[in-house]
């Protein structure tokens, strides 16, 4: 019994600032795509991921204005395993020159390349579209910084890949990073919750 409580979500971004929204990501968010090899230019390493190879690196141009995004970014990427399995670890960083900060990551056993819990048999040499999803994040990329994506076989806090077979990264229209843009002009999302009780309003 009693009045219905207000329903909202409190979000903290990677700089420690808080805001409030009725849903997350915010309603009507614009979705922006960064194609690998285009908006995310190939910046280093070969196009092959294996436990012994250097990172495959992609990076944007410096942003002309502050860029905010949140939710669970998606990385859908064409890959060609050279064995009966493989693993991909994707690291997103906010970079200012050579100084980078980890803002999010995702990891996938390629036997589950379609997403969900359905296991698939991997045929060597057959190209797949791996549908990866990052852990939830809320990120501010300052003006002049870049967004960097690094691909490797595993992360520092994860077990080694189940197979050492290399995985080739394929560029093209179906290899994209998708993010939900946070609009800082929507000021009501950045105001703290307001008390509407008569005792508050009368103060």
Task: Kindly give the residue locations of the regions a language model identified.
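Glycine/threonine-rich phosphate-binding loop and adjacent beta-strand/alpha-helix elements that clamp
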Residues: 1-203
């Amino acid at each position: 019994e009693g009045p219905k409580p207000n329903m909202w979500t409190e979000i903290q971004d990677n700089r420690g600032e808080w805001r409030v929204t009725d849903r997350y990501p915010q309603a009507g968010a614009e979705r922006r795509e960064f194609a690998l090899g285009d908006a995310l230019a190939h910046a280093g390493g070969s196009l092959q991921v294996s436990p012994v190879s250097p990172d495959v690196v992609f990076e944007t141009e410096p942003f002309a204005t502050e860029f905010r995004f949140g939710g669970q970014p998606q990385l859908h990427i064409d890959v060609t395993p050279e064995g009966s399995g493989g693993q991909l670890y994707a690291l997103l960083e906010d970079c200012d020159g050579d100084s980078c900060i980890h803002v999010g990551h995702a990891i996938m056993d390629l036997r589950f390349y379609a997403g969900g819990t359905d296991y698939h048999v991997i045929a060597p040499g057959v190209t797949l579209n791996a549908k990866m999803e990052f852990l939830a994040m809320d990120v501010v990329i300052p003006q002049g910084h870049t967004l960097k994506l690094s691909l490797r076989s595993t992360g520092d806090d994860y077990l080694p890949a189940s197979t050492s077979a290399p995985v080739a990264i394929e560029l093209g229209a179906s290899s994209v990073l998708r993010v939900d843009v946070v609009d800082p002009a929507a000021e009501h999302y950045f105001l703290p919750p307001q008390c509407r009780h008569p005792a508050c309003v009368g103060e």
